[in-house]
């Protein structure tokens, strides 16, 4: 049997102490909207989106969404090796990248970096479909695309001829991600 003093018992059952707001915030929260001027040290990064082509063919193309943008600090981008003019954002749809990137997560993509480093994440266009996958180079110029949710989404391997025929292209390397829980 363990015997506690009244002070230890009270401390054990006391509600957790709240940190003062100053302990977790460094300065005020700035609220901004589309009318707020952009500071010199920030850029607005556009989102990419799939657009269905005419005549209901089911085919899509990837375009810049001119209405949706996300603010990034220029220093933050350059610290990741990304030139601000090469930054884009992409929304993840589906469960193929769970548990790392959930449905609805947003990732930052460097369109100036398309050289595959095995295992890194890339935004890819696959026959006009926008996808985010781990990519691996295969001997002879092929490519392996991997999902984190491999139980439901097994690896996909493509020969160089299949890469061309299925219109698989690397859009850019993922450098940042965020999601809500």
Question: Residue spans of the language-model regions?
Answer:
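Short, positionally conserved secondary-structure boundary motifs
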Residues: 1-103, 164, 177-181
């Amino acid at each position: 049997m363990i015997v506690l003093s009244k002070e230890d018992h009270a401390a054990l059952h006391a509600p957790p102490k709240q940190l003062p707001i100053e302990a977790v915030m460094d300065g005020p929260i700035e609220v901004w909207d589309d009318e707020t001027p952009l500071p010199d040290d920030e850029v607005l990064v556009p989102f990419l989106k799939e657009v269905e082509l005419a005549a209901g063919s089911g085919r899509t193309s990837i375009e810049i969404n001119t209405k949706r943008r996300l603010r990034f600090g220029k220093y933050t981008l350059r610290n990741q090796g990304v030139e601000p003019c090469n930054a884009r954002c992409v929304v993840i749809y589906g469960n193929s990248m769970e548990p790392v990137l959930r449905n609805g997560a947003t990732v930052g993509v460097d369109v100036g970096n398309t050289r595959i480093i095995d295992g890194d994440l890339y935004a890819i266009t696959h026959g006009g479909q926008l996808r985010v996958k781990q990519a691996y180079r295969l001997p002879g110029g092929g490519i392996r695309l991997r999902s984190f949710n491999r139980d439901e989404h097994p690896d996909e391997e493509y020969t160089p001829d299949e890469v061309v025929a299925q219109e698989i292209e690397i859009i850019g390397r993922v450098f940042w991600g965020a999601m809500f829980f």
